[in-house]
Amino acid sequence: MKKCLSFLFVLSLFINVISYAQDSTSKPYVVAGNIGITNNGISIIPTFSLQEPAFNYTGTLSRGGKFSIDPDVRLTFDGRKGGAMIWLRYKLVDSKKFNFRVGAHPAFNFALKSVTENGKTWNITQARRFIATELAPSYTINNHISFGAYYLHGNGLQTDGPISTHFVNFISSFSGIKLGATHLLSFSPQVYYLQIDKEDGFYLTGNVVLTSKKSPIALMYLYNKEIRTNITGSKNLDWNLTLMYNFNKSFKQIK
């Protein structure tokens, strides 16, 4: 039943996005996001990582309104581990102070799996399918401080992996801190609860980002620390460094 509801939510968002696109033909497309390389690919749920260097791409495609299509790809350099998802997102509330976003996505997770046949064992890349929904309220204090929460509910579509995932994250954000004439520092301490089927845990996580007013290149440090957990595969402390290229372009359709 939960999988069915998640699918219907994804479908309804997709239909609304298509309808919005048809009603917004005069508005330019906005393409934004970042491309990065990292020493350790960390998942959207930072409990888990690829434990090797990876390529990251997160982006958004919209026409400046409430709907957006947001791809998120995280893969090792050989393409054998990682994941890919396409978010369909809608801003229920989009005001100066308070924002409330909802979203849903289909996703694939790629992992190595040992297979034995005729006495021989080798590793294959297994693709697992998921459908997830999200709720993301946030409140902006000023140009530098904001607070928010994030809830993700994921449903696995196979029996040999996670079936039900609940991720609840409480977020603080401090941005635009000047470091000299051209550089800016942002940091975001967070605490979250994660439940995967019958296992659960509490964690500290966050990131520190260094940007420049004169360059699209940025450097991000991300960390994840256990508070209390019994989740299989969790590490007491995990981290990564990511070198990112940020972009934000507008394109107008020519008839």
Regions found by a protein language model. Give the residues of each.
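Outer-membrane pore/translocation modules
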Residues: 25-36, 48-51, 74-174, 181, ...
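Short secondary-structure boundary/capping elements
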Residues: 13, 50-54
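Surface-exposed extracellular loop regions of Gram-negative outer-membrane beta-barrel proteins
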Residues: 58-64, 68
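N-terminal Sec/ER secretory leader and immediately downstream segment
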Residues: 56, 72-73
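Bacterial Sec-dependent N-terminal signal peptides
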Residues: 1-29, 243, 247
